[in-house]
Amino acid sequence: MAVGSEEHSLESLGILKKLAANDRPTREAGISALETYLESSQDISQLDFLKVWKGLYYCMWMTDRPKAQRDMALKLPSLLLVADDANATKFVETFWATICREWNNIDVLRVDKFYLLIRWFVHMMFRRLSQSDWELSLVEKWTDILTKYPLNSTNASIPDGIRYHMIDIYIDELERAVNGSETTEANKSSTTTTETTDEDKNSSECRCDFPIAEILRPFESLARDGKSQVVKRRAIAEVLNDSRLKSMWQYSAPQIKPPRDVGNKPAKKRVRI
């Protein structure tokens, strides 16, 4: 942080303390203050972003009612849209570091809202990259982060539950971000209509002005080098061989031969959130 800016740091402004507050209004005030801080393009350290995500994780943990959970799962990833490239990259990396570290501590009653948080975060990652005109250097930094954390092919400490969820949602959220859709699969039930309009049909036209090969690189690495045969098969079948890659973007992913089935039963596919 620049010299003389200590009086305007996250801690001095009380933002981190607000995020960890016991009452919801104070936590929400902390989120609003963080958004304003990000908009100001103040330089934030990696360590401070880890503290930020510790607080934001707590905000999500403490949110119980279904509508409030949906709102919070959208609000937190939306902070990406107001950050500059440098802060956005640190925001992305510390989110995934936090989620991968805390995942095994999330109980069954709370896991669905964190699945929804991940879905919205992936969506907002693509939206933010679109805002930057899919600048290749930024895309590469973010795919490196995905390869290091949720889609790491060799780190056994990363739960497969995160990998399965990423396989489930990745192409869906890429499609919605590219087509400009504001609605995720999980939030369709809360919209006023689900009819397909002419505008929706037009939005499905092919757009190939983004580096799709680089965006898919983490899954190619996972499919080639992953330790779990089930994860590798699903990465190939549900991401790299997704028909939308060809039909919408005229892209053919490298052909990776699925591992032989040696008798392991595939994991039962979880209902999408």
Mark where each language-model region is.
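Eukaryotic acidic, Ser/Thr-rich intrinsically disordered low-complexity regions
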Residues: 2-19, 152-153, 157-158, 165, ...
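Eukaryote-skewed repeat-based solenoidal scaffolds used as protein-protein interaction platforms
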Residues: 76-188, 210
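Long, low-complexity, highly charged intrinsically disordered regions
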Residues: 1-75, 79-82, 108-110, 249-255, ...
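Helix-start/N-cap signature of alpha-helical segments
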Residues: 4, 19-31, 45, 49, ...
